[in-house]
Amino acid sequence: MKVLVLGDVIIDKYIYGTSTRISPEAPVPIVNLDNIKTSLGGAGLVYENLKSLDVDIELFETNQPRSIKTRVICDGHYITRIDDDAQSSGTDVLDLVKSTDFSPYDYVVLSDYNKGVLDEAKDIIKYINTFGCKVI
């Protein structure tokens, strides 16, 4: 069984640190950086989870901008999240989809986080179905 994941890939970034003082500019902690962790989110996380189950899987690359969700954790407490949301062009993605041969795949998993990749989902599904793939 071969699976393709198509959707909004998000980058999840975690900034970990500690604090021993408050900023003089505003009543917020000054975070001393300890560690930064970056991982895939959105459709990328769906891909990673299926891959961990030994599924023969690929991630559809759209060359579209990716949203980045940065979370700041200080002394074990979630302080804030900074979103750098990128919107993809659904029509550009549809053109890319229509230039792709989906016949090697048994399943195509659509993962929509409302970032634009699947704005044309109806047409994407219609095209993929012509290859006999099951769309989830």
Model-derived features: positions:
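Ribokinase/PfkB-type carbohydrate-kinase core domain
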Residues: 1-20, 34-136
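Flexible glycine/proline-rich, aromatic-decorated loop/lid segments
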Residues: 21-25
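Divalent-cation-assisted or electrostatically stabilized phosphate/pyrophosphate-binding catalytic cores
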Residues: 27-34
